[in-house]
């Protein structure tokens, strides 16, 4: 199996065997680093990190990871450079076409990691994902998705690694992805969509629990159903949180809204009626302690 040079844009691009190999390698690297074993596998390598959006955990985990592996993470603030833009969306003296940025950076570094969603693409669902794919088209080095408006594959990889560490297996593990309240309507679907894909792909019994109005991408749901059938596991969508949480090994609460809400000013006010959808004091009793 050769994973060298591969992009990591969405989990579905990789096979189950490839993801399990990545998880095994992550296990080994964590053990080596904690045990004082040198892990300088990326000595003299550079990863360019382009953050169109704010980040605490993702940025610092990427920077720390590159340091631990002996390389350097070079942070690029799009407001301090000519902002990468798709063809037809350029602004004179402000942006630079993605095709040019990608080809310049791939001559200087070994990977380009990008976070982009929301305002930089006018909250157009799929716009940021298209930008990352444009980078992949023009770059000869790996393009890594640090979250776009559709997927957050590295977060999903960390999530399923945690499941593996805690339970040792995915088979028979009930993984519940639950919508949770937030006063902001500017929350992309990337995290929940990648989480349920990762859990379903690796064989968890996966439940998506949400209000009827908070549907995820139909293509993501179809992918989860396919993986569940392939693994002999289950995937279901529920609007009953109390029922969904019963017997769960993992309950993952996260807020998201549908793309239509980004453009609907009145939605913010209707949104508040879901504020009590998750009542932690009640539902915690239904979660099996592990």
Model-derived features with residue positions:
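Short, flexible loop segments at the rims of nucleotide/cofactor-binding pockets, characterized by
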Residues: 88-93, 122-123, 184, 229-233, ...
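A short helix->loop->beta-strand "cap" motif at the edges of active sites that frequently abuts
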Residues: 139-141, 204, 284-290
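Glycine-rich phosphate/diphosphate-binding loop of Rossmann-like nucleotide-binding domains
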Residues: 52-70, 164-253
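Short glycine-rich anion-binding loops that position phosphate/pyrophosphate groups of nucleotides
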Residues: 117-119, 182, 255-260
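Phosphate/diphosphate ligand-binding glycine-rich loop within oxidoreductases
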Residues: 40-164
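Positively charged, low-complexity intrinsically disordered leader regions
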Residues: 1-60, 64, 151
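Charged helix-capping and loop-helix junction motifs
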Residues: 96, 128-129, 189-194, 268-279
């Amino acid at each position: 199996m050769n994973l060298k040079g591969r992009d990591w844009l969405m989990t579905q691009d990789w096979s189950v065997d490839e993801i399990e190999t990545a998880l095994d390698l992550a296990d080994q690297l964590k053990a080596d680093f904690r045990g004082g074993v040198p892990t300088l596998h990326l000595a003299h390598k550079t990863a360019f990190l382009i953050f169109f959006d704010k980040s605490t955990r993702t940025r610092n985990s990427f920077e720390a990871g590159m340091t631990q592996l002996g390389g350097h993470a070079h942070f690029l603030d799009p407001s301090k450079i000519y902002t990468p833009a798709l063809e037809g969306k350029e602004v004179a003296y402000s942006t630079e076409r993605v095709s040019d940025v990608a080809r310049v950076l791939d001559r200087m570094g070994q990977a380009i990691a990008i976070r982009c969603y929301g305002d930089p693409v006018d909250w157009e669902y799929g716009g940021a994902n298209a930008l990352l794919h444009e980078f992949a088209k023009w770059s000869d080095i790996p393009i890594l998705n640090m979250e776009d408006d559709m997927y957050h594959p590295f977060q999903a990889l960390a999530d399923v690694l945690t499941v593996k560490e805690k339970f040792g297996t995915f088979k028979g593990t009930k993984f519940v992805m639950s919508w949770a309240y937030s006063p902001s309507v500017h929350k992309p679907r990337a995290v929940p969509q990648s989480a349920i894909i990762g859990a379903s792909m690796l064989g968890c019994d996966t439940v998506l629990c949400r209000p009827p109005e908070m549907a995820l991408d139909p293509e993501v749901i179809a992918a989860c159903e396919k993986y569940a059938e392939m693994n002999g596991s289950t995937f279901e969508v529920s609007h009953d949180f109390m029922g969904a949480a019963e017997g769960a090994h993992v309950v993952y609460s996260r807020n998201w809204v549908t793309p239509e809400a980004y453009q609907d000013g009145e939605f913010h006010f209707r949104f508040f009626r879901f504020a009590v959808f998750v009542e932690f004091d009640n539902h915690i009793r239904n979660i099996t302690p592990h």
